[in-house]
Amino acid sequence: MSFVTASGKTSAKHAPKPATWAYAEDFVAEPEAAAAARESAAPLGITSVGRGSAATLTFLARAVQARAVVEIGTGAGVSGLALFAGMRPDGILTSVDTEPAHQQAARKAFLSVGIPTQRFRLISGDALHVLPRLSDGAYDLVFVDGDPMEYPEYVEQGIRLLRHGGLIALDNALLGDRIADPGQNDEETESVRAALELVRDHDDLVTTLLPVGDGLLVAAKR
């Protein structure tokens, strides 16, 4: 893998070797509950966030002392557990997913570690219908792991939902190496590229792209 610097030159010499990347990805041990949730995801056809991404989500939630978090794409609860691990003890997670079976798995994962039901709202439905009903500037962190075709719309809604100083994080930001490949021009890839550019070029956001998991784009709202 090579990286493009501000000067337009690539910095391939700084790219980690596969063994180094794997070491970093697994550096933080995964809790048993998260490992169990990850295992339950496979039969449901869910691709959960990587270990490195999960550890980063915990770090981000702790860094902003998150009390109110929105998650787009519940999955089997792996990312939700990671967010809870960093949130304040009174924090509430609002998680949206189109698949009730996914949310049932996530609910089981949350309850398995003693998270009370009043700390999570699992909303079954289309995120583009749910998000507009949530309050402006009321959330500390928005995590996007939904349909890549809707990433630009998620970003627009996420920015609206964030308080000043809040964070938005987009998983699958490298999309299996497709984003960096100029030969990949399918609709899904172009949609994610558009979302990345929207975040990068937004005047109200400070942005970084982290090479953890399948890529995690993180931005703070000024």
Residue map of PLM features:
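A short alpha-helical cap/connector motif
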Residues: M1-L141, P148-A169, A173-R222
